[in-house]
């Protein structure tokens, strides 16, 4: 057919004929060989570098961990001289206690960060929110609604006072208004049954220690208006607090009288409030010291109401006090009838004996002034700015803070404390990595196993008691993260808060509603079985717990984060962080309190006499050790080695178990890669991370407060005391014998 129509055009290029090829010169050959050699070397180096492992972890998580550890520590301090300064010196230089805080530390920073998460989830309205969550958000909005709160002044409180027989000092003609109807039984019971406020006599419904599936009525000494009985000495370091306390009473009484348009007699206010202080001082002196209340066996005194009437008769306002009427006044609010045969556990027989001569000295007016005040003082910070400010000097004397906590923080905490499951749901949905649960379960299994293996090393405990200790350890139930129900069972969560209905412009009434709801719920338990599966903590909490009555350990979602735990951080840090916390909580089942309860949570002596005696002897070592620490921030006072014993036993046991579990991990999985920028191996990093959990400091006022009220040793002594007893620590840091961190005498219980 001839040429194709789509034929391509070809351009013909005439190329010249090549010249004759030239030979390479020696220089060119040499250079070519050199280039070839350099290329081979470069390729080899690249290949080697790509596969070379210098043993240092360079992941972003490792870099973050290393940066945190380096920032917090002071490497110029000798670790064997003062490990607190070595581990926390950098933290102390970089951090100042906020004006709103009584203390500040890594624990508090985690709590601050958790509060930010709570604020975000509580202030965000969502159309798909279930009713329980809607209620939590409404409660939060009512709490931050400062304009509504301020506009009401003290009116919500004034409306409430007649319900509790008024406050005599702020009432005209109190005797005429209330005197005829006032009885001690009714007045004390009203505060208790409606609002959960226990003054003079602390009656409550709780688990029966000796039969932990049942509830029983307990009678105990009351809490005080000041942090501890020591404050009522009102001299030296306690003088300012006593003065501020009485001034606080007078200020609030004055504000109420002003609002009620009543005449103000300053002398009369001072006279009556000083009388309240005098009465409370006597009550405080009648209470037992904490160190005398450490043995649950001695604390437990079960008797009938008839026996209480016989053993602890009281006379108030010239009339005999009826224990039966008093108890029925409280329990009738939840439709429970009590007879003289009702069993009651008395925790404070000595207090009730000492109470009798005190109460005969004071009039109904004096007693009601104290009782109403103790209720009012709790509510002042829920009123307008003027009322809040009346508390400033008192707050400063007790906590050293010069500013109030930010409203949103206080409100986030308040809602979390009252609706822990609704808030817990919001928190875990926003911030909790679910895979953490399985990793922590595995850690618990490892540390429980180490605890049981360690029993074999104990020479002070006989075989019979060891066997029972093992049974108890195996029976410990664990709770990790959060109860599944709070996320998966909408109906159950809604039903939990069914009776609660909040108004956004009535914060005070919402608080009262919560008090009534919570107290009613607790009183109703008297005729119910104990729910042993119930969680003893909400999810949005940076803490961990052990319940002796349930033999249960709890690790809420809030604590499962760095520095305690991360599935991505080095295992040495996890074992030194959450591993130590797990060991600590397990050991609580065997401390000076927990050891008295059996595997089912009942108060039963399961120890042979010899083992019990040896336990006390071993413990005494720690009582002396921690009791010899003096705290400069608390005016040089010594720690109370008896009151902090349980926590110190748990710290020491927990650290030892976690370290042994980490050694087992290394044997099984091999050494981990080192962290960048730190000239420390992983054994050393284990102890460093443990210590940095406790970096922090206190205001002097709060140090004075906590040394009397906190069952934990201050953070610096938790580090020093525990590590002084650890031979493994001294080995890891090569501490010479008898250096400060490596004393020859070491204490060990578990």
Curated annotation (Swiss-Prot):
Inhibited in a dose dependent manner by opiorphin. Activated by K49-P1-20, a twenty-residue synthetic peptide shortened from the snake B.asper myotoxin II. The chain crosses the membrane at residues 29-51. Its main location: membrane. Residues 2-28 are cytoplasmic. It is found in: Cell membrane. Glycans are attached at residues 145, 285, 325, 628. Changing residue 422 to D: In CMT2T; late-onset form; results in reduction of neprilysin activity. One of its GO terms (cellular component) is early endosome. Myristoylation is a determinant of membrane targeting. Glycosylation at Asn-628 is necessary both for surface expression and neutral endopeptidase activity. It is linked to Charcot-Marie-Tooth disease, axonal, type 2T: An axonal form of Charcot-Marie-Tooth disease, a disorder of the peripheral nervous system, characterized by progressive weakness and atrophy, initially of the peroneal muscles and later of the distal muscles of the arms. Charcot-Marie-Tooth disease is classified in two main groups on the basis of electrophysiologic properties and histopathology: primary peripheral demyelinating neuropathies (designated CMT1 when they are dominantly inherited) and primary peripheral axonal neuropathies (CMT2). This is Neprilysin. It comes from Homo sapiens (Human). The gene is MME.
